[in-house]
Curated annotation (Swiss-Prot):
Keyword Cytoplasm: yes
Chain spans, region Interaction with UBL1: 870-880
Region (SUMO interaction motifs (SIM)): 866-918
Region (Disordered): 912-987
Composition-biased stretches (Low complexity): 912-929
Subunit relationships: Interacts with Nkx1-2. Interacts with FAS and DAXX. Probably part of a complex consisting of HIPK3, FAS and FADD. Interacts with and stabilizes ligand-bound androgen receptor (AR). Interacts with UBL1/SUMO-1. Binds to NR5A1/SF1, SPEN/MINT and RUNX2.
A Pfam family it matches: Pkinase
The organism's taxonomic lineage, starting at the top: Eukaryota, Metazoa, Chordata, Craniata, Vertebrata
Name this protein carries in UniProt: Homeodomain-interacting protein kinase 3
Protein's organism: Homo sapiens (Human)
GO terms for cellular component: cytoplasm; cytosol; nuclear body; nucleus; plasma membrane; PML body
Region (Required for localization to nuclear speckles), start-end ranges: 855-1011
Gene this protein is translated from: HIPK3
List of catalytic residues: 322
Length: 1215
């Protein structure tokens, strides 16, 4: 009995770049080292890969003796006879490959698990490891494995092992094998009722069929088609899979993270299932990375997405029953990293139709109730998911049993024996356990290796890399060595929560096992435990990566959701209304809209769909409100202010129905509208639900003026007219878009960028100036302001993309920044004017300088070292300076040094009280080095009889492969800060520190302001006097003016502060630097007043912790927050200051519940102005400020770890 085989060289299927992973292994386990000889059929080889224009003939054969599911490090035998291939000329070459019982050692890396490989590398499809005993050796088998013993002429320079494929003989005339597999030919056409598909490549073969890569003719879509066997033994399970996929097709596949099935049809009596094409499965991803452990920040989004899928399946009463790395696919590793979907429902079943003693799941991920023959439910999927995340964390299967006995033995040794009540009920308990009755009380014990081998004849083998006595020991494996400070503490806390969740997922008793819904609420997933480290680079990276799993709704959702867009007009008596439907929005893309201003979105910034990497969306409906005064074809009334609002649901594509993996490119004019009435255009997300706020005990009079709004109207409509006097929720802006306006603004948020005006009177090519201002701290017990660090950023119009340059980057460079600011104001505009000590009131009835261009602000051309202290001065125009002093004299008894232009760089007049003290905070800098983590193994590894995989993952939190650029952080260097050593301070470059009041620009006043770097040695600042080695420079930062007119405009522009978890009721002083809280610089607007509400529309009172007193006739003050709880042990590093060098702040989702311990999330009142405040998530090289006047607000990077109310993030990348 000879065997027929075909040998596939390594370059076969080399062109494949992606695969739909639904191929499965046989349900066999080795009963001996050699299988019985079988007859196998011939099959076609992909002729294109051999250079043939047609598939070659069937070829020859040799015999294999391969132990299936062999453990790592064990040997196998192979007998070969001959390999026959057909060349391009048609001649046959017989390659003698005689090998008498060739003894081959299994590879140590890449072959540690007993996997069958059809393809190599990313081309290999995930194969099922259905590991069931080989009770019937005459049953049909398909064996595929990697071999590397073929002759040298079959080897290529790639060095990949050749793949050997075997299949049964006896092909029928209907192109179906004896086992029911359909024999495919390349470029064969598969026809459904609606579409035709051309076969491009073979992707893989499994238990229930095979998968091919196909092209949907007439389109540019590539799909994966699973062709089921027509064998009677697989017919019923195929029908179950089809019915489950039909049920899942009614759900949103992107929202619930499972593969989308398009259609099902019959082709020559074979059922064909059409799926979306996915990129790479997790096993191939691990293999590609040499099976290096993945960091927890990467495991978390994978866990969250798979748990979301399991939660949906559980709600539908479905069991996946084959969850493993091969069945978790990366959608697009390049465009959507760590975005995964669950595939392969070939083993799925309904929970009501489960049968005990059924072999389900791959053996490594098989739940104890399946092994013991207990009744089971959806909990088996949670066990599998626990094994998967443990494998991702270890880089190795947690329980890699070669036999079911080994599997339950590994589980029992690590987690203890199953409960007696489980063993008593299990139908297969006696296979692995024996009951002892000779003792005082009867009990179960695990059979010894000798007893099991004597009963079954199968010898147990050790295949574990790590032998754990407890799951708690998992936290001590692969420790990260390159973390320090708060990053190290955050990593340790993350590991503790990971192990806590893992233990709940791997509970032997299925009734006690955690559910998918509980998993999503676990601290490891929602990252509550990381809130104690808000300024840790590691935590920033965790939140940023976690945001990716929320990016699931995109333009492709229209295929599953037939929702009509809701269009709501602005409810205003002075504004016209417009109602349109989705068809009108579609025509909006193609028509050319004439504009009197620039379009909202510029062609230079590509916008991605909702599933983009940084797009944050969820099931919560979010909207886009476009508020132009007029749209083309609709005449605008010039006699009164006009505005329209168009609401588009997030499921409606804005430009094109592109696939999720394609970025959306919005052309100029798509959102362009015709302007009139000098109104402003805004892009504002409308929030449909808001976290309820606690009842207020103290009321600010200015908030009551805004009036109350119905909760139903919250976030639904915004009136955009000449006077911004409405109330608008302020979201946390996290996506890449910038809208510009040349309007002078005073802001206290972190990113401040003055963009290039669209046009200037002299048509000059102006440069832009950007300042990254770190927010200021407020001292609860004392009225002192602590300086945050800040850094300059160079914006040059000659460079296509500007970048925020940190002090580390600009070391040794000459930096010159010029800002051309065009001021603009409406007639009868009202503003507010104040200096750092006193507030005066005046009105500007006629602002005739609305179009007057401001003079440039020049930074002195001096070397900018890595550490520098910058003094803002205004000594270029003495006459104007004196004029300012004459207009604003301090009323306080103490002389204001800021007003006298003699302010020392380390002394600043308090923004809250004229009699407050002057202080600064010393600062250091911590910059984790982006070095690779060294290979580290645990002590338990010595107990393993298996070799370890070379190398470990490079999971540095600040390296080049981190989603965040390398960032530095200011560490508190007070005396009692234990975790910051003097050695660290000396060896790391210190960050430049300066006290920066609100930067205010005044209409009608033109001044040249010079900013000079005057310090080259950064030392801790000494309270009340200048530090040694520092130059004292006069500064007029406190001499700028604002206009204040009414009690409504005198509202305190306070940034709501979110407390850290664990902050205690203790007055801050110099010895408790880590306990101080952050207060934010209030913003000032020198244009039309636009007030934001604090909380919901009907929330007119401020919270108790926002209560404050006013002084000097209603001068705005900074209101501190009281502490609420005691600090944790990690607190000294948990409350370090943020670094100005952070290029991209952390993204967080509202569901992480980053708020007060009571769950309160506060609104951020921010003064709006038609001027650019770009999103902080914009990359250093992606910002091109060439947009017209628009109102936009960016969230502060100092809010990293704290979401702003409303609690939902924007779905759109440009919101």
């Amino acid at each position: 009995m000879a065997s027929q085989v075909l040998v596939y060289p390594p370059y076969v299927y080399q062109t494949q770049s992606s695969a739909f992973c639904s191929v499965k292994k046989l349900k066999v386990e080795p009963s001996s080292c050699v299988f019985q000889e079988r007859n196998y059929p011939r099959t076609y080889v992909n002729g294109r890969n051999f250079g043939n224009s047609h598939p070659p003939t069937k070829g020859s054969a040799f015999q294999t003796k391969i132990p299936f599911n062999r453990p790592r490090g064990h040997n196998f035998s192979l007998q070969t006879s001959a390999v026959v291939l057909k060349n391009t000329a048609g001649a046959t070459k017989v390659i003698a490959a005689q090998a008498q019982q060739a003894h081959v050692q299994a590879p140590q890396i890449g072959a540690w698990r007993n996997r069958l490989h059809f393809l190599e590398g990313p081309q290999r499809c995930g194969l099922k490891r259905k590991s069931e005993e080989l009770d019937n050796h005459s049953s049909a088998m398909q064996i595929v494995d990697e071999l590397s013993i073929l002759p040298a002429m079959l080897q290529t320079n790639m060095g990949n092992p050749v793949t050997v494929v075997t299949a049964t003989t006896g092909s029928k005339q209907n192109c179906t094998t004896g086992e029911g597999d359909y024999q495919l030919v390349q470029h064969e056409v598969l026809c459904s009722m609606k579409n035709t598909y051309e076969v491009l490549d073979f992707l893989g073969r499994g238990t229930f069929g095979q998968v091919v890569k196909c092209w949907k003719r007439g389109t540019n879509e590539i799909v994966a088609i699973k062709i089921l066997k027509n064998h009677p033994s697989y017919a019923r399970q195929g029908q179950i899979e089809v019915s489950i996929l039909a049920r899942l097709s009614t759900e949103n596949a992107d929202e619930y993270n499972f593969v989308r099935a398009y259609e099902c049809f019959q082709h020559r009596n074979h059922t064909c299932l059409v799926f979306e094409m996915l990129e790479q499965n997790l096993y191939d991803f691990l293999k590609q990375n040499k099976f290096s452990p993945l960091p927890l920040k990467v495991i978390r989004p994978i866990l969250q997405q798979v748990a979301t899928a399991l939660k949906k399946l559980k709600s539908l009463g479905l069991i996946h029953a084959d969850l493993k790395p091969e069945n978790i696919m990366l959608v697009d590793p390049v465009r959507q990293p760590y975005r995964v979907k669950v595939i392969d429902f070939g083993s799925a079943s309904h929970v009501s139709k489960t049968v005990c003693s059924t072999y389900l799941q791959s053996r490594y991920y098989r739940a104890p109730e399946i092994i013991l023959g207990l009744p089971f439910c959806e909990a088996i999927d949670m066990w599998s998911l626990g094994c998967v995340i443990a494998e991702l964390f270890l880089g190795w299967p947690l329980y890699p049993g070669a036999l079911e006995y080994d599997q339950i033995r590994y589980i029992s040794q690590t987690q203890g024996l199953p409960g007696e009540q489980l063993l008593n009920v299990g139908t297969k308990s006696t296979r692995f356990f024996c009951k002892e009755t000779d003792m005082s009380h009867s009990g179960w014990r695990l059979k010894t290796l000798e007893e099991h081998e004597a009963e079954t004849g199968m010898k147990s083998k050790e295949a574990r890399k790590y032998i754990f006595n407890s799951l708690d020991d998992v936290a001590h494996v692969n420790t990260v060595m390159d973390l320090e400070g708060s990053d190290l503490l955050a990593e340790k806390a993350d590991r503790r929560e990971f192990v806590s969740l893992l233990k709940k997922m791997l509970l032997i008793d299925a009734d006690l096992r955690i559910t998918p819904a509980e998993t999503l609420n676990h601290p490891f997933v929602n990252m509550k435990h990381l809130l104690d480290f808000p300024h840790s680079n590691h935590v920033k990276s965790c939140f940023h990566i976690m945001d990716i799993c929320k990016s699931h709704l995109n333009s492709c959702d229209t295929n599953n959701h037939n929702k009509t867009s809701l269009l709501r007009p602005v409810a205003s008596s002075s504004t016209a209304t417009l109602t349109a439907n989705f068809t009108k929005i579609g025509t909006l893309r193609s028509q050319a809209l004439t504009t009197s201003a620039h379009s909202v979105v510029h062609h230079g910034i590509p916008l991605q769909a909702g599933t983009a990497q940084f797009g944050c969306g969820d099931a919560f409906q979010q909207t886009l409100i476009i508020c132009p005064p007029a749209i083309q074809g609709i005449p605008a009334t010039h006699g009164k202010p006009t505005s329209y609002s168009i609401r588009v649901d997030n499921t409606v594509p804005l430009v094109t129905q592109a696939p999720a993996v394609q970025p959306l490119q919005i052309r100029p004019g798509v959102l362009s509208q015709t302007w009139s009435g000098r109104t402003q255009q805004m892009l504002v997300p409308a929030w449909q639900q808001v976290t309820p706020l606690a009842p207020a005990t103290t009321t600010l009079t200015s908030e009551s003026v805004a009036g109350s709004h119905r909760l139903g109207d919250w976030g639904k409509m915004i009136s955009c007219s000449n006077h911004y006097n409405s109330v608008m929720p302020q979201p946390l802006l996290t996506n890449q878009i910038t809208l510009s306006a040349p309007q002078p603004v005073s802001v206290g948020i972190a990113h401040v960028v003055w963009p290039q005006p669209a046009t200037t009177k002299k048509n000059k090519q102006c440069q832009n100036r950007g300042i990254l201002v770190k927010l200021m701290e407020w001292e609860p017990g004392r009225e002192e302001i602590n300086a945050f660090s800040w850094s300059n950023s160079l914006q040059n119009t000659n460079i296509p993309h500007s970048a925020f340059i940190s002090p580390k980057i600009i070391n040794g460079k000459d930096v010159e920044e010029v800002s051309c600011i065009e001021t603009q104001d409406n007639q009868n505009s009202e503003g507010e004017a104040r200096n750092c000590c006193e507030t005066s009131i005046r009105q500007d009835s006629d602002s005739s300088v609305s179009d007057k261009q401001r003079q440039t602000i020049i930074i002195a051309d001096s070397p900018s070292p890595a550490v520098s202290v910058i003094t803002i001065s205004s000594d270029t125009d003495e006459e104007e300076t004196s004029q300012r002093h004459s207009l604003r004299e301090c009323k306080g008894s103490l002389d204001c040094e800021a007003c006298q232009s003699t302010l020392n760089i380390d002394r600043m007049c308090s923004l809250s009280s004229p009699d407050s003290t002057l202080s600064t905070s010393s600062s250091g800098q911590s910059s984790p080095s982006p070095c690779k983590r060294p290979n580290s193994m645990s002590d338990e590894e010595q107990e393993s009889s298996c070799d370890t995989v070379d190398g470990s993952p490079t999971s540095d939190s600040s390296g080049h492969d981190s989603p965040f650029a390398e960032s530095t952080f200011v560490e508190d260097t007070h005396e009692n800060t234990e975790l910051v050593s003097s050695a660290d301070t000396e060896t790391k470059p210190a960050v430049c520190s300066v006290v920066v009041p609100p930067v205010e620009l005044e209409n009608g006043l033109n001044a040249d302001e010079h900013m000079a770097n005057t310090d080259s040695i950064c030392q801790p600042l000494i309270k009340g006097r200048s530090a040694p080695g520092r130059l004292n420079q006069p500064s007029a930062v406190g001499t700028r003016q604002q206009k204040l007119t009414s009690a409504f405009q005198q509202q305190h522009l306070n940034f709501s502060q979110v407390q850290h978890f664990g902050s205690g009721h203790q007055e801050w002083n110099g010895n408790f630097g880590h306990r101080r809280q952050q207060a934010y610089i209030p913003t000032s607007v020198t244009s039309n007043p636009f007030t934001l509400s604090h909380g919901s529309p009907n929330h007119t009172a401020v919270h108790a912790h926002l209560a404050g007193n006013t002084h000097l006739g209603g001068q705005p003050t900074l209101l501190p927050y009281p502490s609420s709880a005691t600090l944790s042990s990690a607190a000294p590093v948990a409350h370090l200051l943020a670094s100005p060098c952070t290029s991209r702040p952390m993204l967080q989702h509202p569901t992480y519940n980053i708020s007060h311990p009571s769950g309160i999330v506060h609104q951020v009142p921010v003064g709006l102005n038609p001027r650019l405040l770009p999103s902080p998530t914009i990359h250093q090289t992606q910002y091109k400020p060439i947009f017209p006047p628009h109102s936009y607000i960016a969230a502060s990077p100092a809010y990293t770890g704290f979401p702003l109310s409303p609690t939902k993030l924007s779905q759109y990348p440009y919101m």
